[in-house]
């Protein structure tokens, strides 16, 4: 449906974000990433204590594509 839109101020849009005004048939944001992390990674919270004396992240990813995403460039 048509609408009158007033002033718009865009502060920030992330890399996989969508800004949309008006009618739309489909919105399909596409994003993919790969992360390798060892022990003690991705910890959140207050007063996190992690003791990892011997830790190694071994990465042997021999395939080229993990999962094909249709529509990606």
Curated annotation (Swiss-Prot):
Gene Ontology biological process terms in this record: sporulation resulting in formation of a cellular spore
Keywords assigned: Germination, Sporulation
Expression induction or repression: Expression is sigma K-dependent and negatively regulated by GerE.
Pfam families for the chain: gerPA (PF10676)
Domain of life: Bacteria
Keyword hit for Acyltransferase: no
Family: Belongs to the GerPA/GerPF family.
Functional summary from the UniProt entry: Required for the formation of functionally normal spores. Could be involved in the establishment of normal spore coat structure and/or permeability, which allows the access of germinants to their receptor.
Protein name stated in the entry: Probable spore germination protein GerPA
Gene coding for it: gerPA
């Amino acid at each position: 449906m048509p609408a009158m839109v007033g002033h718009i101020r865009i502060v920030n849009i992330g890399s996989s974000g969508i800004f949309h005004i008006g009618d739309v048939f489909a919105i399909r944001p596409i994003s993919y990433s790969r992360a390798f992390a060892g022990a003690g990674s991705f910890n959140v919270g207050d007063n996190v204590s992690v003791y990892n004396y011997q830790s190694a992240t071994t990465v042997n990813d021999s395939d080229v594509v993990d999962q094909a995403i249709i529509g990606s460039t």
